[in-house]
């Protein structure tokens, strides 16, 4: 399925309740685009004292960052973290390294324009060639989602490395991701199932299109990350690929876990 994509692709899926999963090209670095906004939000909540009050500046910026994926909000939150976008990016990188995300880099701000049991093989099968800038992998982004899910229960690597990120903070961020306004990607097919909820954060630029998130179903929850790159431009075929990966994973986990 992924090997048939006309471009470079990678994916990682794992049941967080059963532990089984699969991966392809999961350690290949892709231009990160907006996927790292999830890491920005996580870092802000780890530093902020308590959940931002509704309507406060930080609450408003976080909502703009996650729900419509606003670049100006991302830059404002990086400045909030440490006085500038570059210094704020350093803080985000520090958080990612603290939980073992070694193949992701937050490189400055965004250009604002108007308009669990059995190890899953993680390797580089086909890495895209691109210039300097933000990058991440399907493996790293799914690890961040897994860490947030664990943190929502008060456990896991984020709680250990960032005690300021409370279970309530993590649940607040997950709630925001449940309200993302975006063209269907991971939720292309599984989103039609009324017993399924998808919490996700996508990212896209002209040459790259990704989606990563959590899929909750009546029998459990799984994490999924699908990344695509094509030097001459990506299209909605990337969204359909993400949708097929999520649908296949859900079908498999339902069969295995009941």
Question: What is the role of each PLM region?
Answer:
Residues 1-9, 14-18, 78-258:
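Penicillin-recognizing serine hydrolase domain
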Residues 18-28, 58, 122-126:
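Glycine/charged-rich beta-loop-alpha catalytic/anionic-binding loops adjacent to active sites
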Residues 38-42, 71-72, 90:
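A generic alpha-helix surface/boundary motif
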């Amino acid at each position: 399925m992924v090997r048939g994509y006309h471009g470079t692709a990678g994916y990682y899926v794992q049941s967080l309740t059963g532990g089984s999963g699969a991966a392809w090209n999961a350690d290949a670095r892709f231009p990160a685009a907006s996927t790292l906004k999830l890491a920005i939000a996580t870092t802000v909540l780890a530093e902020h004292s308590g959940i931002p009050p509704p309507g406060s500046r930080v609450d408003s910026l976080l909502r703009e960052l996650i729900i419509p994926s606003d670049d100006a909000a991302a830059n404002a939150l990086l400045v909030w973290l440490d006085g500038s976008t570059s210094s704020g990016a350093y803080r985000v990188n520090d958080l990612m390294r603290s939980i073992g995300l070694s193949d992701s880099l937050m490189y400055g701000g965004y250009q604002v324009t108007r308009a669990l049991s059995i190890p899953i093989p993680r390797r580089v099968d086909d890495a895209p060639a691109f210039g300097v800038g933000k990058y991440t992998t399907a493996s790293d982004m799914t690890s961040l989602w897994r860490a947030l899910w664990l943190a929502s229960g008060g456990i896991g690597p984020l709680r250990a490395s960032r005690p300021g990120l409370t279970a309530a903070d993590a649940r607040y961020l997950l709630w925001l991701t449940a309200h993302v306004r975006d063209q269907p990607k991971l939720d292309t097919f599984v989103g039609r199932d009324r017993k399924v909820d998808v919490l996700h954060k996508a990212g896209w630029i002209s040459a790259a299109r990704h989606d990563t998130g959590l899929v909750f179903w009546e029998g459990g929850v799984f994490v999924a990350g699908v990344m695509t790159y094509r030097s001459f431009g990506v299209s909605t075929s990337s969204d359909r690929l993400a949708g097929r990966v999520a649908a296949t994973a859900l079908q498999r986990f339902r069969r295995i876990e009941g």
